[in-house]
Amino acid sequence: ADVGGPDLAIQPFSLAPETSGTASAFVRRVLKGEPLAYEVEIKSETTPALRQVAATPGSIYYTSVPLSVRQCSVKTIPIATKANRPFVTPYIEPRIPSSACPQQRNQINRDALKNNTYPLARRLFVITKKGDSVEAIAGRSYSNILLSAEGQMLIEAAGFVPTR
């Protein structure tokens, strides 16, 4: 489909699905378990990948919403689950243009993430060990910190959607 701009070849970038939870989820949910195409250039970390996207016309990359929405050098795009479904933005509309950045930055569309209308939203879990071992106690303590009011504020400050 015509999206405007010059007619460029698409250069996809990704983290390795074997080492990235986001890339693994993308392969599982979007590609239905099929491997990434050979054209996909694997990057070792998100920051260099975002820099490469900013420097490469026609490139595309996916990453967690908190790592991309507030960036000044790249544009996040709305996505839909099917051709007849509405596109949902990972940011609060209207989109703030990069020319206004860094004085103004796009904000995360927390409602779309919380109510799962953003198609690639996923939940993250803390899994702890059972029992009374030091590891189990530490895991429960960590969970309790995250579920506390202060923990929920820290989760939100990191760009994620609090659970409470």
Could you tell me what each predicted segment is?
Residues A1-R164:
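Exported/periplasmic ABC-transporter solute-binding proteins
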